[in-house]
Structures are given as C-alpha cells and as structure tokens.
Amino acid sequence: EVTRCKWAEGVSLDYIRYHDEEWGVPVHDDRVQFEFLILEGAQAGLSWSTILNKRAGYRKAFADFDPAKVARFTQKRVEKLLQDPSIVRNRLKVESTVTTAKASLAVQEEFGTFSDYIWGVVDGKPIQTRYRRDRDVPATSAESDALSKDLKKRGFRFVGSTIVYAHMQATGLVNDHVTGCFRHRPCARLK
C-alpha cells in the first residue's frame, strides 16, 4: 500500500495513474506543454476528472495538440467542435485553444521553444516544495502570478494565476507532491 497525495485517493484508476505517472514530472516537450495548458484552461469551473475523461477526445479534436495545426483552425472548424460531445463545448474555451495555439507559436519564434519560455519562470529548475499536507499546498505563487501576467500580455486566454499554477504542478515546474507521498522523492530527483 502506497501513500499518495490526498487528492489522488479514492478516485478513478485514470486519476490515480495521472497522479502516479504524470503529475509533477518535468515536461520539456512543446506539444505536451501546450496540451496541459489547454486542458488546465478547459478545467476552469469543472473537475479535473471530467477533463481526464475527455482527454482522448481533446487529443482527437485538437490535432493531437499540435499548435501549428490548431492555429490554422477556421471558424467553421470551431463551430464543428462546439457540437463535439467528446470535449467541453464552451465557446470561449474552444476559441481560446486556437488563440493559445497562435500565441504559443509566437513564443516559440521568440524563445526557440515554448517549453524554454515556460521554464524560464523557474530559471529552468523545478521548485522543490516540502508541504506535509494537501491543504498547505497553495493555489498560486509569485511565479504563477508573473507567468500568468506575461501569458495574458502575449494574448493567451484562460491563464489566470490559479490555472497557471496548476499547469506548473502538472508539468513539473513545481513539485507539490506532499512529503509523505510516494512520488515526492522521485519527482524531486527529476529535472
């Protein structure tokens, strides 16, 4: 029996697998960074389990999260996506995915990779926290505030500080596995 972060106990196997295999693991791939930013934004106002359940649908609907392809989506394509039950059919969220794809390509152009830009907020090294209880883990940080502000300035949408902090946690910019969680130490060794 392993000890996990409380939020990953008594949940579906997909949720547990997400906690055990993905959450907090450093991501340096632009496509995966884009995927998580889109999924975190889609989750706004919903449960993460809803998004995990729709993840395959999102991958299919949004060209396997290839930002170059998503950036070329037409309004007609957006309208079609709004009829797709395999994703969250919220107009603002669907349209923001196209906007975010375009903005991420501009960031790639400026910084070399989208990942390098994102990782710049933590100087390229994951922040290692030592929270003992889930309730001690913050919803935002100075880094997420700064990144959120800059993303908004660059035209990204659905990137408030809470969403950005969740993105940072998911993609390993910050290791917020509680110290008693079996994933805390392994994630602390990752770069």
Where on the chain are the PLM-derived regions?
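HhH-family (HhH-GPD) DNA N-glycosylase catalytic core used in base-excision repair
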Residues: E1-K191
